[in-house]
């Protein structure tokens, strides 16, 4: 099994962490949760704009028109898909009601799981493609996606637990949303493999960079602010950028990057 695929699987499995936190009865600090989302956004923004996009544009045979065009395609494509999918409400992340609720709530829980699953699928592809192109960037993206998946697990397990009263069912449904990300990575592994030209890989990287920027700006940062309105999510973003930038410098100094 390839390292990029393992990273994708681990990132997707982080959904279970959020799921278990949601059913253990321990309220996760909103401040920590919001900071982790900002931290993940910072990692994604720095990697996307300072590493992935420049590397894609510098690839042999890649034209600026194609490179920036794919970046914009990934950006707008994510925003369009995001508008069509149901969203979790931050105030529902820590819902603790254990009484089964009406069927309407069950339907909402199913739609929420479906929406997050569809949202996670391209993230799995993005993680695999990034790690396949550059392993050090793959580690960074996998970490950012894993941090992002923890509150997603919370988002799924809350309404499902409230709708069914079953911890096992809630964890199962949260796991399904995480498996969608793993499925995206597996499909990328099966379809792309090593038989892909540098130009095609660079184009995919540019599109993935656009997806990551949109995810950070449109979802992670606003969600962090909604979860913890009393603190600025920019602190987490700046910390994520600083830590990721410092780690990349260390790797390049050591001759790994």
Curated annotation (Swiss-Prot):
<feature type="transmembrane region" description="Helical">
    <location>
        <begin position="171"/>
        <end position="191"/>
    </location>
</feature>
<feature type="transmembrane region" description="Helical">
    <location>
        <begin position="137"/>
        <end position="157"/>
    </location>
</feature>
<dbReference type="Pfam" id="PF02535">
    <property type="entry name" value="Zip"/>
</dbReference>
<dbReference type="GO" id="GO:0046872">
    <property type="term" value="F:metal ion binding"/>
</dbReference>
<keyword id="KW-0472">Membrane</keyword>
<feature type="transmembrane region" description="Helical">
    <location>
        <begin position="61"/>
        <end position="81"/>
    </location>
</feature>
<feature type="transmembrane region" description="Helical">
    <location>
        <begin position="109"/>
        <end position="129"/>
    </location>
</feature>
<keyword id="KW-1133">Transmembrane helix</keyword>
<feature type="binding site" description="M2 metal binding site">
    <location>
        <position position="149"/>
    </location>
    <ligand>
        <name>Fe(2+)</name>
    </ligand>
</feature>
<dbReference type="InterPro" id="IPR023498">
    <property type="entry name" value="Zn_transptr_ZupT"/>
</dbReference>
<keyword id="KW-0406">Ion transport</keyword>
<dbReference type="InterPro" id="IPR003689">
    <property type="entry name" value="ZIP"/>
</dbReference>
<feature type="binding site" description="M2 metal binding site">
    <location>
        <position position="120"/>
    </location>
    <ligand>
        <name>Fe(2+)</name>
    </ligand>
</feature>
<dbReference type="GO" id="GO:0005886">
    <property type="term" value="C:plasma membrane"/>
</dbReference>
<keyword id="KW-0862">Zinc</keyword>
<keyword id="KW-0812">Transmembrane</keyword>
<feature type="binding site" description="M2 metal binding site">
    <location>
        <position position="123"/>
    </location>
    <ligand>
        <name>Fe(2+)</name>
    </ligand>
</feature>
<keyword id="KW-0997">Cell inner membrane</keyword>
<keyword id="KW-0408">Iron</keyword>
<dbReference type="GO" id="GO:0005385">
    <property type="term" value="F:zinc ion transmembrane transporter activity"/>
</dbReference>
<feature type="transmembrane region" description="Helical">
    <location>
        <begin position="195"/>
        <end position="215"/>
    </location>
</feature>
<feature type="binding site" description="M2 metal binding site">
    <location>
        <position position="181"/>
    </location>
    <ligand>
        <name>Fe(2+)</name>
    </ligand>
</feature>
<feature type="binding site" description="M1 metal binding site">
    <location>
        <position position="148"/>
    </location>
    <ligand>
        <name>Zn(2+)</name>
    </ligand>
</feature>
<feature type="binding site" description="M1 metal binding site">
    <location>
        <position position="123"/>
    </location>
    <ligand>
        <name>Zn(2+)</name>
    </ligand>
</feature>
<keyword id="KW-0479">Metal-binding</keyword>
<keyword id="KW-1003">Cell membrane</keyword>
<feature type="transmembrane region" description="Helical">
    <location>
        <begin position="236"/>
        <end position="256"/>
    </location>
</feature>
<comment type="similarity">
    <text>Belongs to the ZIP transporter (TC 2.A.5) family. ZupT subfamily.</text>
</comment>
<keyword id="KW-0813">Transport</keyword>
<comment type="function">
    <text>Mediates zinc uptake. May also transport other divalent cations.</text>
</comment>
<feature type="transmembrane region" description="Helical">
    <location>
        <begin position="5"/>
        <end position="25"/>
    </location>
</feature>
<feature type="binding site" description="M2 metal binding site">
    <location>
        <position position="152"/>
    </location>
    <ligand>
        <name>Fe(2+)</name>
    </ligand>
</feature>
<keyword id="KW-0864">Zinc transport</keyword>
<feature type="transmembrane region" description="Helical">
    <location>
        <begin position="32"/>
        <end position="52"/>
    </location>
</feature>
<feature type="binding site" description="M1 metal binding site">
    <location>
        <position position="152"/>
    </location>
    <ligand>
        <name>Zn(2+)</name>
    </ligand>
</feature>
<protein>
    <recommendedName>
        <fullName>Zinc transporter ZupT</fullName>
    </recommendedName>
</protein>
